[in-house]
Amino acid sequence: MLYQGKVKQVWSTDDPDVLEFRFTNQISVFDQIIPSLIPRKGESLNRTTAHWFKLVEEENVCGTHLVEVNSADRCLVRKVEVIKEPGAIPRDMEWVFVPLEFICRHYLSGSAWRRFQRG
């Protein structure tokens, strides 16, 4: 395992250019891990992720790092260099991976609500 997030793990593979994401059944609320698990939550997250990435590619919005879904709760992705400081992107770089996170909720809550209130 290369990285452990709140609800996702990143694993190396035999291919140095490909990583494996494993979505867990853990729950994250207000940026904290809850000790309870939701059965098949990892599978649901993986299927939802794959759906949106495939849709983005089919509609020619942009390319993604998704290679394939290789099991219920896992997918293979292309390894990319994530530049964490915007000023660190070389001006002559032609392909830049922009990390985006989408959180879908029925209503605005948590840290997103606090940011919205601050304007």
Which role does the model predict for each range below?
Residues 1-119:
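Active-site loop/lid in soluble adenylation, ligation, and acyl-transfer enzymes
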